[in-house]
From Swiss-Prot:
EC number: 3.1.-.-
Organism: Bacillus anthracis
Protein name according to UniProt: Putative phosphoesterase BA_1241/GBAA_1241/BAS1148
Motif (HXTX 1) on chain: 34-37
Active-site residue numbers: 34, 115
HXTX 2 (motif): residue ranges: 115-118
InterPro entries, A to Z: 2H_phosphoesterase_YjcG-like (IPR050580), Cyclic_Pdiesterase (IPR009097), YjcG (IPR022932)
GO molecular function: hydrolase activity, acting on ester bonds
NCBIfam families: PRK13679.1
Top-level enzyme category: hydrolase
Family note: Belongs to the 2H phosphoesterase superfamily. YjcG family.
Keywords carried by this UniProt record: Hydrolase
Length: 172
């Protein structure tokens, strides 16, 4: 079973991201706009209960926080991904670190850069053109975050929520 752990932004932020993703992201139909806390990983069905229990513990140790989304960035030249930058807060860093240590030990492919993907799989020329146009626009959004989600991948490649974890003591 393939799992991932994400934060979903507000509908307003998702709508703004989806307006761009429809044109620039081939994964648009597979998963809503999100901030990845832990990249997709394979696990056995019998481990799911332990994973859920650990995520409840992590959520209870994390206070709700404000998500700040603004500006457009890119991972080029490593890959042609365009994204909305998400300010790295202590809470986001804590969540990411907890999901890559102890029970969740897994090699990281990249350093943690919180973001909302709005384009990927673009040619070099298309990437440069889209990035240039989007960098001239002003984007800034903020919202309270009080939960994260464990997703699993269906056979058709789409992702769906398995469980939601509310942040803060007494919420799980």
């Amino acid at each position: 079973m393939k799992l991932g752990i994400v934060i979903f932004p507000s509908k307003m932020i998702q709508d703004k991201a989806n307006g761009l993703r429809k044109r620039y992201d081939p994964h648009y139909a597979l998963v809503p706009p999100h901030i990845t806390l832990k990249t997709p990983f394979e696990t056995q069905d019998e481990q799911l209960e332990s994973i859920v229990n650990k995520l409840h513990t992590i959520a209870s140790k994390t206070n709700p926080f404000t998500l700040h989304v603004g500006k457009v960035g890119s991972f080029a030249p490593v890959n042609n991904v365009i994204y909305f930058k998400v300010e790295k807060t202590p809470e986001l860093t804590f969540l990411n670190e907890e999901m890559h240590s102890g029970f969740f030990t897994q090699e990281r492919e990249y350093a943690f850069v919180p973001h909302l993907t709005i384009g990927q799989g673009l040619s070099d020329a298309e990437h440069a053109d889209v990035l240039g146009r989007l960098r001239m626009k002003d984007f800034y959004y903020e919202q309270p975050i009080d939960r994260f989600h464990l997703l699993y991948q269906l056979e058709n490649g789409t992702w769906t929520v398995h469980e939601t974890f509310r942040l803060g003591k007494g919420n799980n």
